Amino acid sequence: MHITDKTHSSKIPIIHGDLFTFIDDHIHGGNNGCSIIIPHVCNNINSFGAGFAAAVANRFPIVKENYHLLGSKILGRTQFIEVFKNKTFGHSLIFANMISQNGAISSKNPRPLNYASLCQSMIMVSKFIREKFDKDQSVQI
C-alpha cells in the first residue's frame, strides 16, 4: 500500500501473520532492518493485560511494569519504553504507551477512548520520532 499527499509519501506494510515475528525480522535485519515504534492505547485505571496489551505483557513484561509505575491522573501522557537495541546496527524496538482511554469499556462507559488525549499522545509520538531519530534513519510505526 502506498499513500501519497502533496508533501509526503509513505509506504505502509501490510503484515500477514504474527506481528512480533515481523518486528523481530526488522530489528534484527542488519542493513535492511529498521527501528520500530509500537504506539498503542492504554487506559488510565492501571489495568494492562487484555487484548493487545496482554500479548505485549507476555512477550515484553517491562512494558507492563513501566506502565504500572505511572500512577493516576495520566490521561493524555505517553510513555516510551525501549525494549531492545541492536548494538550492531542501532535498530531499536520502542513501545509507546498512549494513555488515551478514560476507564474501561462498560455499559456506563461504552466509548472510553478520549479523542483529545489520543491526539495529544499522537503528537508526543511524532515529537519523539523527530527528536530521537536522524532524518535518514528508517523507522516504522
Go through the PLM ranges and name each one:
Residues 1-140:
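Macrodomain-like recognition of ADP-ribose-binding/processing modules
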